[in-house]
Design a protein with these regions (language model features):
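SAM-dependent transferase fold signal centered on methyltransferase-like domains
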Residues: 1-340
Length: 340
């Protein structure tokens, strides 16, 4: 039986755990850091079958996972911990020879684990080099994962795709370049990667609820023309952009010619059912097969019910391709759709 260490957004681990229980017959699920990390087993499902199934249809709230190949008591002693990490790394053998290896070290708050992520990484990297591997930060063939709780140390090695994310704990980090107007921009950047949907493949986007322009700025940077709809002002840096048209009206008040856009994005904080009504009414302004990236606000802490209701409502006009709680989501999830 294989055990996996898993991560969800803070406060959403109970929902990720429930997804796992529903998906995996016979699984055993146990919490680690309250509300954020937990373990589960493959239960009655063969490991390769399970991984293939989870990759094909990712759970909404499970952000990251890795197989636990060794579990040991955590120690606050640097020498003891370093010895344990090096001993595990020595077991990797042929797996890492001539391979690019990312080493990701995380710890729960208040864990006695004595190293920061860089120090822990260095202990393992030394052995990886001795085995003929190349430690890297990105584009790895293998990922060595280390996660320390208050009592236990979990370590394992797996491919990036089997982790569901190649970022530590499934938490991508983007540089806040000068062109990034708001933190909301990171949400769209993460969606682009999570959905494997290069934004520069589109030509004209409709951004509903665009102010102050976080998502609009990303789309403009990718070379798109953008029609931004919001009664509020956009960031001054965007006002004179030649590919931006800003319509200062509510999204419910606008209309366009059919097929005007090949991408719709919407990050409005309104009631999600009201947002759905607006987006569905605007479906005809999208070309056939156009994509939409839409934030779904989770109301009243009933995420499964909210997602079920909203995907049904959007399903009248759109094919639902993926729903995922991104690292940059809070009380919400992000959905990728295609116009029918």
């Amino acid at each position: 039986m294989t055990t996996y260490a898993a991560t969800a957004n803070p406060g959403f681990a109970p929902y990720a755990m429930e997804e796992i229980r529903r998906r995996i017959p016979g699984t055993k699920v146990s919490g680690l850091a309250p509300g954020e990390t937990f373990t589960f087993t493959n239960g009655d499902v063969e490991t390769e079958t399970l991984l293939k199934d989870l990759r094909k249809k990712e759970p909404v709230f499970l952000r990251h996972m890795f197989p636990v190949e060794q579990e040991m008591d955590v120690s606050g002693d640097p020498e003891t911990t370093a010895e344990s990490l090096r001993a595990y790394a020595a077991t990797l053998g042929e797996r890492v020879r001539d391979a690019k290896v990312a080493i990701q070290v995380r710890k729960e708050q208040h864990s006695p684990f004595p190293f920061g992520s860089a120090e822990g990484r260095d202990e393992i990297a030394t052995v990886v080099r001795e085995l003929g591997g190349e430690p890297v930060a990105r584009e790895a063939d293998w990922i060595v994962s280390v996660y320390a709780t208050k009592k236990k140390l979990f370590v394992g090695c797996s491919t990036p795709r089997d982790n569901l994310s190649d970022w530590p704990g499934g938490a991508p980090r983007f540089r806040k370049d000068e062109g990034v107007i708001s933190r909301a921009a990171f949400k769209l950047l993460e969606a682009e990667k999570a959905f494997n949907l290069p934004l520069d493949r589109f030509s004209h986007a409709l951004d509903l609820g665009a102010s102050p322009g976080g998502w609009t700025s990303v789309l403009l940077e990718r070379g798109l023309k953008v029609t931004a709809v919001d009664p509020a002002e956009m960031d001054p840096s965007l006002e004179t952009h030649p590919r931006l048209r800003h319509i200062r009206r509510n999204a419910a008040e606008v209309s366009f010619a059919p097929g005007s856009f090949d991408l719709l994005v919407c990050d409005m904080s309104w009631d999600p059912h009201h947002t759905c009504m607006i987006v569905n009414e605007l479906a005809d302004v999208l070309s056939a097969g156009a994509s939409g990236i839409i934030t779904l606000k989770l109301m009243y802490r009933k995420p499964f019910q909210s997602i079920q209701e909203l995907t049904k409502e959007y399903g009248y006009r759109f094919d639902i391709l993926k729903v995922k709680q991104l690292f940059h989501n809070r009380e919400e999830v992000t959905m990728w759709v295609k116009r029918k």
